[in-house]
Structures are given as C-alpha cells and as structure tokens.
Amino acid sequence: MCGIVGYIGKNYSKTFVMDGLSRLEYRGYDSAGFACLNPVDSRFLYQKAPGRLANLIHELDLHPIDGHVGMGHTRWSTHGTSSQENAHPQFDCQKTIAIVHNGIIENHHEIRASLEQAGHIFHSQTDTEPIAHLLETLIASHSTLKAAIVDLLARIEGAFACAILLQDYNDQMLLVRKRSPLCIGIGDNEMFIASDPLAFAGKTEKILFLPDESFALVKKDIIELYDFWGKPLPLLVQEIKIDWSESEKKGYEHHMLKEIYDQKNAIFNSVIFLRSISTVIWDHVGLSKEHAKNLEKITLIGCGTSWHAARIAQFFFEQICLVPTRVHLASEFRYMSFFPERNSAYIFISQSGETADTLEALRMINGMHLSTIALTNVPSSTMVREADGFLLTQAGQEIAVASTKAFSTQIAALYWLAHRLALEKGIINRAQLETAEEDLLVVAEVLENSIENYKRDIIQRLAKFYAQFKKAIFLGRHISYPFALEAALKLKEISYIFAQCYPAGELKHGPLALIDAQTPVFIFSHDDPLIYQKLVANAQEIKARQGHLVVFALEGQHEIMALANQVFVMPRIKPLLVPLAMTGLMQFFVYQIAKELNRPIDKPRNLAKSVTVE
C-alpha cells in the first residue's frame, strides 16, 4: 500500500520522484522519504519525514539534495508507528545499501534476531530494515551481486516490492517483486521506476511490468531481468498511454466531490464501451460462447466497496439470467472449504486491480484451472494480466480513497453483463438487452439529478445537523441491504462517525437495543410491495422507541415518509437499479457531513486507496 518511485538517468532525480510520489500518495501518507546517490562521492544523501508528503517536501526545500540516481517512498504503516525512524528508505549498518519497500516480510522477526546475534544494530521497528542488513551480509559472502540477490530472495518470505540502491553499484538500481506491483518506464537514456505507472505520465509510454517473483538490475540504458532463481527473463515492454490530467480536481474542492459528479459520464462511457464489445464479449472475458451458455454458477469475489457491488450484482445474475450466484469476501474466501465446479465462472472485482486479498483469491482459482474474470478500472493492473479475461469499468482515474464512481460503474458493468449472459442463454432477446442499456443511461441522469434536486444549501444544513451525532445505524432489505452496507462504510470512512449496518429483518434480534434519540437510523427503501411493507413495519418499531429516522424513499411511498424525521425522495425506476440511482445523493450527503466535521476527505486517517498487502 506504499508508493515507490525511482529514477536513474541523465537528469537529476528529485523532481521526478517528488512529482511521482504526489501522484501515488493515495497509496499511503503516514510518512515519506527520499534518497539519492551523491554525484561526487556516491554516498547516500537522504531526507525522511513523518506525516504527509508535504512535510518531506518542506524538509527538502530547507535542505536540498539531489542526484542522478534516486528513489522515494510514501508509507502506509504496517510495522512500526509513523515516525522519522520508521520512514523509508531504510539502511544497512554502514549505510551502503538503501531500500524502499511495499508489502510485508513475514519472517522479518527471525531475520532480525539472527542478524542482531551477529552484531547488526537496527534503528527502526519496520519489517524493511532487516532486508538491507541481510543483503549487506550476503554481498560480503558471495562472489557476485547476482548470487547474493538470489540467496536473499530464497530467505525472505511474504509479499513485497522493493527498490534498492547500493553505494558500490552506483550506476544501477535493484528492483524486486513478489505479489506486489512494480514497473519500469523506459525513457531516452533514463529509466523511471514506480509501483504504479501513473507516476510515469508525461515521461514515457513504454512500460515493463516486472513479472511475479522476479528481480531486475536497472541502469539508465539497460535492464537485466531475472526470475528468483537467476534465470534470465525476456523484456515484455508495453505501450500504455497515461493521462494524469483527468486526475486533477478541475475546480472542485475535493477529488471525492469531483468523482461524485463524474458518475453520470462514467456510466454513459461504460454503456458506450459495453455496447462496442457486445459481439466479442466472451472473448473479452475469457469464456467460450458454449461455456457462457452452459454456465451453472457464478462466484463474485471482492473487498470493501467492491464486495458491496458484488452483493448487489448477485441479484442481477440470479434474477436476470437465472444463474445461482455466491458472493465472498476475498480475505475469507481463501480459507474456506472449497468445492470446484466446472460449469462456473469466478468474477474478481477491484477498482485498482491490485487488491492483495482479491489477487490471492484469483491466483488460487487460476491454480485450479477454473474460469477467472477480472472486473477492474485499471487496464495495466495485475488482475488484468493474470485473469483469463477481464472487463474494464470506464470510471476514469479515481483518486479519493473512498470509492464513488468505481462503485457505480462496477454496478453498471455487472448489470449489463447479467443481461448479456441472459441473451446468450436465450432468456431475453436483443431488444431487451438494448432496453437494459437505455435503463442505465436513464439511471445515470437520475443519479446526478437527485443531487441537484436537493439544493446544496439544504444538504449543507442537514449535514450540519447530522454531523453532531456520534453513531448511526443503517438498514435495508433485499437489494437495498448491500447498498446500506456501502452507505455505512462511506460514513465511517470519511466522517469517522461509527456506523453499523444490519438487514432490517434482524432488527428485533439485537440491534433494536441500540435505538435511541441520539442514534439516527437510515433506511433505504425498496420498490417491491411486500418488502416495502416490511420496511414500514421496521420504521414503526424504530419510531415507537423514539428513534430518529432518515429514509431514502421512492415517489409515492407516503406511509414510510410520514414516519421519518428526514426524507430523501427518489423517482421510481427499474427496481434492480434503485441502489445505483440512490448512490450519488447518498455519497453527496455523507461527503457534506465529513466536510462539516472538517475531515481530510480525500485521504482519511489510517486508510489507503490501493490495499496491496493482506
């Protein structure tokens, strides 16, 4: 979840590294550091600072350093607190080796203990520093650097990406990758290194993604690539256009606010894209037509917001194309009893395509030679490269940690895919698929209009009132329950207000004890008459206990509106698309609450955008 950026070449490194880190700060912002080799004597020059990247930039302004070979790091803490000592780079005893690292070294305690017995002195609590000390020892005991690296990689366990500078090899950088992304941008007599190619925007479109379990020795004009056992690997360079401009705020106060308003166009773009690949969709997602037609079970796997999108999509696949569908949290899926089924497909959902738990679940299913599909927003991601096939959401770059437009485009893509599968199975005709596409365009308009229907001053006034509460309860039934889960997560993520979500039918099985006037209860309504009446009954129970009720209702649902302290009314649309229609207003309301509380909305505490460690 940390950001790594490096440079080696004809120019000085600091400007590129700092610009790159600013683009990758979403990966972590507990501390930051920069190191380079002094062009005069090849000694390390470095600065580290706890807190946001701005603190490091300030230190570098006060104490300028630079060199032609340099690297930087923005950290999300997994081992050790946010402090100058724990910030990267980390060094060996003699400060001849510097390392920046993303991931987790699972056996770092054993390595540290062994090296301490041998006389090594450690200065941090990180799992990174032991790598530098171990490499120091191995270089001394091997005749070649390559042999030392192979020995190092045989000794460390976990998932990691590392960039390493060595004073005695001052014209190159060592890169190591195991189950954590790392790539090289190839320039003219210069090389750019990053954990996300977003850092390369405006510099190069020639990109080499390090294969899993590989290491590279990189000079300004040469790349030597090897597997962990020292066998040379081919250089598979891709041409990828990266546009950083779409990631700018463009006048909005926060990235999250911009991305909320991006959703209409993102859904429009999704429909245009999905229409364009409709005739070749099964090639795209790695299924044969025959397999798609005979599909008997679908499994959806994701984490966080992507898991909520999967929970919503379960209703699509079961009701539209009549395929039994299971949904699993990726972090739990790998440890469950598993029964492979051949006429099945596994869809892995991740905005970044780098989510560690989801990737490991994908690799587990790949190892069983079952059909895997990646649904992601990033075409250059690891999931795209490793799945049998993929489907790209058309959200555009999402910068805010709290997902907005990635969530809505995931729902749109899965809704369309369910209809396309139903067409393949002969359950619907092409006209019905086209109607579903039009329905998505309609709901995109509703999503945006629902925000405008509640003028900003009204929402701001309501946000000021609801920001005073310390906790909240969210309820839903059927397809509105997973949407309630997402709403509760959004409130927790960006406002830090404690929020708990339950299926409304479970209210009497414990949660009713939490109801009081100081705990607002949010209910997300449903179009089905039976489910709606059950929600009305839940609302009555809450009011009978002096609960404060906020309802997201549909036009004409007067009975539940009459019970509410606050109502948000949505137009009636296709029942399965109600959660998507409610998405924009829900996000905007929660955003305003967080703004009222003066929270760092784009970068909430303790969270990172791309969760690349388990």
Regions found by a protein language model. Give the residues of each.
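Conserved short alpha-helical segments that host acidic/polar catalytic motifs at enzyme active sites
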Residues: 1-249, 253, 265-296, 335, ...
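Acidic/histidine-rich
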Residues: 159-190, 466-493, 529-531, 536
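Active-site phosphate/pyrophosphate-binding segments
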Residues: 263-299, 389-520, 531, 597-614
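Generic C-terminus detector
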Residues: 548, 563, 573-614
